[in-house]
Amino acid sequence: MAQKIEGHINLNVNAGEATAAPPIGSTLGQRKVNIMEFCKAFNAATQSIEKGTPLPTVITIYVDKSFTFIVKTPPASYLIKKYAKVKKGSGATKKEAVVGKITMDDCREIAKLKMPDLNTKDIKAATKIICGSAASMGIEVVGN
Protein backbone atom coordinates (compact mmCIF):
# COMPACT_ATOMS: atom_id res chain seq x y z
CA MET A 1 0.00 0.00 0.00
CA ALA A 2 1.25 3.47 -0.85
CA GLN A 3 2.25 5.83 1.93
CA LYS A 4 0.12 8.87 2.66
CA ILE A 5 1.73 12.12 1.61
CA GLU A 6 1.78 14.94 4.15
CA GLY A 7 3.18 17.54 1.77
CA HIS A 8 5.72 18.71 -0.76
CA ILE A 9 8.54 21.23 -0.31
CA ASN A 10 10.33 22.98 -3.17
CA LEU A 11 13.84 24.18 -2.34
CA ASN A 12 16.88 25.35 -4.26
CA VAL A 13 19.83 23.56 -2.67
CA ASN A 14 23.45 23.84 -3.78
CA ALA A 15 24.97 20.53 -4.86
CA GLY A 16 27.03 18.93 -2.10
CA GLU A 17 26.31 21.78 0.32
CA ALA A 18 23.14 20.71 2.14
CA THR A 19 23.43 21.64 5.83
CA ALA A 20 21.07 21.92 8.77
CA ALA A 21 21.29 25.72 8.53
CA PRO A 22 18.39 27.74 7.09
CA PRO A 23 16.59 27.45 4.73
CA ILE A 24 16.82 23.63 4.80
CA GLY A 25 16.88 23.21 8.57
CA SER A 26 14.00 25.55 9.32
CA THR A 27 11.84 24.26 6.47
CA LEU A 28 12.30 20.56 7.28
CA GLY A 29 12.27 21.20 11.04
CA GLN A 30 8.75 22.65 10.83
CA ARG A 31 7.62 19.36 9.30
CA LYS A 32 9.54 17.32 11.93
CA VAL A 33 11.68 15.59 9.29
CA ASN A 34 15.15 14.30 10.19
CA ILE A 35 17.26 17.15 8.80
CA MET A 36 20.65 15.42 8.98
CA GLU A 37 19.29 12.34 7.22
CA PHE A 38 18.11 14.54 4.34
CA CYS A 39 21.43 16.41 4.20
CA LYS A 40 23.46 13.18 4.05
CA ALA A 41 21.19 11.66 1.39
CA PHE A 42 21.16 14.85 -0.72
CA ASN A 43 24.93 15.34 -0.55
CA ALA A 44 25.48 11.69 -1.49
CA ALA A 45 23.05 11.98 -4.43
CA THR A 46 24.72 15.15 -5.73
CA GLN A 47 28.39 14.27 -5.22
CA SER A 48 28.90 13.78 -8.98
CA ILE A 49 27.63 17.31 -9.73
CA GLU A 50 29.92 20.34 -9.49
CA LYS A 51 29.82 21.58 -5.90
CA GLY A 52 27.84 24.78 -5.44
CA THR A 53 25.56 24.29 -8.45
CA PRO A 54 22.02 25.34 -7.46
CA LEU A 55 19.59 22.45 -7.89
CA PRO A 56 15.80 22.76 -7.64
CA THR A 57 14.73 19.95 -5.32
CA VAL A 58 11.23 18.64 -4.62
CA ILE A 59 10.95 16.90 -1.24
CA THR A 60 7.92 14.68 -0.64
CA ILE A 61 7.14 14.22 3.05
CA TYR A 62 5.02 11.30 4.21
CA VAL A 63 2.79 11.05 7.29
CA ASP A 64 5.35 8.85 9.12
CA LYS A 65 7.93 11.70 8.64
CA SER A 66 9.92 9.75 6.07
CA PHE A 67 10.73 11.51 2.81
CA THR A 68 11.83 11.14 -0.77
CA PHE A 69 13.32 13.82 -2.97
CA ILE A 70 13.76 14.55 -6.66
CA VAL A 71 16.72 16.63 -7.81
CA LYS A 72 16.05 18.54 -11.02
CA THR A 73 18.51 20.07 -13.47
CA PRO A 74 20.14 23.44 -12.65
CA PRO A 75 18.13 26.54 -13.63
CA ALA A 76 18.55 27.68 -17.24
CA SER A 77 19.66 31.12 -16.05
CA TYR A 78 22.53 29.57 -14.06
CA LEU A 79 23.69 27.51 -17.05
CA ILE A 80 23.41 30.46 -19.44
CA LYS A 81 25.48 32.68 -17.12
CA LYS A 82 28.05 29.90 -16.74
CA TYR A 83 28.42 29.45 -20.51
CA ALA A 84 28.53 33.24 -21.09
CA LYS A 85 31.07 33.62 -18.25
CA VAL A 86 29.14 36.45 -16.59
CA LYS A 87 28.17 36.86 -12.94
CA LYS A 88 24.82 38.53 -13.53
CA GLY A 89 22.34 39.09 -16.34
CA SER A 90 21.44 42.55 -17.59
CA GLY A 91 19.12 44.80 -15.61
CA ALA A 92 17.71 46.04 -18.92
CA THR A 93 16.06 43.64 -21.34
CA LYS A 94 16.78 42.28 -24.80
CA LYS A 95 19.02 44.43 -27.00
CA GLU A 96 19.26 47.46 -24.70
CA ALA A 97 22.21 46.19 -22.68
CA VAL A 98 24.12 43.11 -23.83
CA VAL A 99 26.29 41.76 -21.00
CA GLY A 100 27.62 38.63 -22.70
CA LYS A 101 27.42 36.27 -25.65
CA ILE A 102 26.84 32.56 -26.13
CA THR A 103 26.76 30.53 -29.32
CA MET A 104 23.85 28.59 -30.74
CA ASP A 105 25.83 25.42 -29.95
CA ASP A 106 25.94 26.50 -26.29
CA CYS A 107 22.14 26.96 -26.37
CA ARG A 108 21.75 23.48 -27.86
CA GLU A 109 24.02 22.02 -25.16
CA ILE A 110 22.03 23.73 -22.39
CA ALA A 111 18.77 22.55 -24.00
CA LYS A 112 20.05 18.94 -23.96
CA LEU A 113 20.83 19.27 -20.24
CA LYS A 114 17.44 20.86 -19.50
CA MET A 115 15.31 18.49 -21.64
CA PRO A 116 13.90 16.48 -18.69
CA ASP A 117 12.53 19.67 -17.09
CA LEU A 118 11.27 21.49 -20.20
CA ASN A 119 7.75 21.09 -21.52
CA THR A 120 8.88 19.83 -24.92
CA LYS A 121 10.49 16.71 -26.33
CA ASP A 122 11.84 18.47 -29.45
CA ILE A 123 15.46 19.68 -29.24
CA LYS A 124 14.78 22.58 -31.65
CA ALA A 125 11.93 23.88 -29.49
CA ALA A 126 14.03 23.42 -26.35
CA THR A 127 16.86 25.39 -27.98
CA LYS A 128 14.44 28.22 -28.80
CA ILE A 129 13.30 28.28 -25.15
CA ILE A 130 16.91 28.60 -23.97
CA CYS A 131 17.67 31.29 -26.59
CA GLY A 132 14.64 33.25 -25.36
CA SER A 133 15.83 32.98 -21.76
CA ALA A 134 19.29 34.19 -22.79
CA ALA A 135 17.83 37.15 -24.68
CA SER A 136 15.70 38.18 -21.70
CA MET A 137 18.86 38.12 -19.54
CA GLY A 138 20.67 40.46 -21.92
CA ILE A 139 22.91 37.73 -23.30
CA GLU A 140 23.26 37.70 -27.08
CA VAL A 141 23.04 34.41 -28.99
CA VAL A 142 25.46 34.35 -31.94
CA GLY A 143 25.65 31.81 -34.76
CA ASN A 144 22.91 29.97 -36.60
Curated annotation (Swiss-Prot):
The keyword rRNA-binding applies. It comes from the Bacteria. It holds the Pfam family Ribosomal_L11_N. The keyword Ribosomal protein applies. Keywords: Methylation, Ribonucleoprotein, Ribosomal protein, RNA-binding, rRNA-binding. InterPro entries: Ribosomal_uL11, Ribosomal_uL11_bac-typ, Ribosomal_uL11_C, Ribosomal_uL11_C_sf, Ribosomal_uL11_CS, Ribosomal_uL11_N, Ribosomal_uL11_N_sf. One or more lysine residues are methylated. One of its GO terms (cellular component) is cytosolic large ribosomal subunit. GO terms for biological process: translation. CDD domains: Ribosomal_L11. GO terms for molecular function: large ribosomal subunit rRNA binding; structural constituent of ribosome. Belongs to the universal ribosomal protein uL11 family. Part of the ribosomal stalk of the 50S ribosomal subunit. Interacts with L10 and the large rRNA to form the base of the stalk. L10 forms an elongated spine to which L12 dimers bind in a sequential fashion forming a multimeric L10(L12)X complex. PANTHER family: 60S RIBOSOMAL PROTEIN L12, LARGE RIBOSOMAL SUBUNIT PROTEIN UL11M. Forms part of the ribosomal stalk which helps the ribosome interact with GTP-bound translation factors. This is Large ribosomal subunit protein uL11. It comes from Rickettsia bellii (strain OSU 85-389). The gene is rplK.
